[in-house]
């Protein structure tokens, strides 16, 4: 018989730098999970992606064991890195903060494809372009 799920927790944590401090401690502590065990497992799983924020979905079972699935970094983080900007524009329609080539948009879409609900790469690219526009990042050909 499969284990009974008592909770699912979604967090966005820096790769390789999860600690028992908030937000990890309070989120997992209420389910009685061994927080250090999760931190060690998460840090080992994300060791190669230093400097990125990695979303993680943790499934907690009745016997206080857990499993987790890491996702790809948020599109906004990947776009900020590609454009070389610290943050998006406060007024995206008026003030542009950076430029990204369409080829880079395609790379990001290919990376995010498994997490997006898009059927093909073109649809995924349009989603990423929409995110870029809402951040005030201009898309240039190339």
Swiss-Prot record:
Functional summary from the UniProt entry: Forms part of the ribosomal stalk which helps the ribosome interact with GTP-bound translation factors.
GO MF terms, alphabetically ordered: large ribosomal subunit rRNA binding; structural constituent of ribosome
Keyword entries, A-Z: Methylation, Ribonucleoprotein, Ribosomal protein, RNA-binding, rRNA-binding
Post-translational modification: One or more lysine residues are methylated.
Pfam families in UniProt: Ribosomal_L11, Ribosomal_L11_N
A GO biological process held by the record: translation
Gene Ontology CC terms: cytosolic large ribosomal subunit
Record note on quaternary structure: Part of the ribosomal stalk of the 50S ribosomal subunit. Interacts with L10 and the large rRNA to form the base of the stalk. L10 forms an elongated spine to which L12 dimers bind in a sequential fashion forming a multimeric L10(L12)X complex.
Heme is among the record's keywords: no
Protein name: Large ribosomal subunit protein uL11
PANTHER family xref list: 60S RIBOSOMAL PROTEIN L12, LARGE RIBOSOMAL SUBUNIT PROTEIN UL11M
Family listed: Belongs to the universal ribosomal protein uL11 family.
